[in-house]
Amino acid sequence: MPSKKLNPPIILLGNVRSGTSMIQGFFDLSDEVCTWFEPRTVWTYAAPGRRHDRFTRDDATPRVKRYIRNRILKYQLEHGGQRVMEKTPSNIMRVPYINEIFPESRLIYLVRNPLSQMSSSEFRWQNVLNKNQFMIRLRETPKTQLHYYAWRLLHDNFRKRVLRKKHVSIWGVRYPGIYEDKKRFTIEELIAKQWVEASKTCSADLDEIERTSPGAVYRIRYEDFIMDPAKHFAEMCGHVGLGVEQGILDEVAKQADTSSQDKWKRLDPEVIMRIKPIVEDEMSVNGYEFPTEMPSEEERREILSRERLTSGGQGSTIRN
């Protein structure tokens, strides 16, 4: 019979389209872990109507802590006592809040080059929540808070299906002020600002945690991870106190996707140069260099051709 004691959840922090789904899939290979796909409405229990994702320690009241810890424990017990692993992207703006609720959890932080992230993100701005995702979200949401999320879903469906808007109202991390920025930025510029604000906020919050708890955070860049995925995944597991068998590491090495390294080269060079002043400084902080040469038309055609074979879709950041 599984223990009714809450095991420290494994919390992976990372922006949208940064590789967190891949790494969550690797944790799912372990018999000791059950993964929970982005239980956003559980995390926002403190303030479901807030128009941004920034939550602090002050939001983690005793009632909120009790509710969220009980929800994680319930999921753990429903899965035979396995440790719960989750990777809700908006939690990148909630590090102090999460640390207050789960001080026993050691954190993992994944960051990715914003140009590569943008090439994946813009297409998602064009999609509303599908029926299956909606039903899952509905089951996860506290019954007293359903109306907050129903309104957002109806609003985005109305924009897409009735007004024929290309993009949903907001997709991805909502930093404070994003709705004002949306009025003056292009979608590509807004995605760039999302990356910058999330990176700055999360890094500062993690620095604060490490000042009092050295070694509490494992930080890795996506680009470094895929160069030696088995090694870095073993380090992640060790960081959170999870054993890992060689067979799992072999599978990680086999499954890691290294094909997306040059995906940013499909972006329109005009878009790349437009977001340069937004992202360049924060890229440098994370060890990235802004490209000095733009992709050639031949490179872009090759990447687009390859992607059409695998996905059949493209976003407005791409120019034929």
What are these regions (language model features)?
Residues 1-79, 128, 137-149, 255, ...:
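PAPS-dependent sulfotransferase catalytic core
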Residues 1-10, 133, 147-320:
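PAPS-dependent sulfotransferases, especially Golgi type II membrane carbohydrate sulfotransferases
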Residues 12-14, 84-87, 109-111, 219-222:
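Short beta-strand segments
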Residues 21-24, 43-45, 92-95, 115-120, ...:
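Short catalytic/ligand-binding loop motif for oxyanion handling, primarily in non-cytosolic enzymes
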Residues 46-50, 98, 119-124, 129-133, ...:
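Short aromatic-enriched loop/helix-cap "lid" or pocket-rim segments at secondary-structure transitions
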Residues 72-94:
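Glycine-rich phosphate-binding loop used to anchor ATP phosphates in small-molecule kinases
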Residues 87, 98-124, 236:
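Conserved phosphate-donor/acceptor-positioning beta-strand/loop module used by diverse small-molecule
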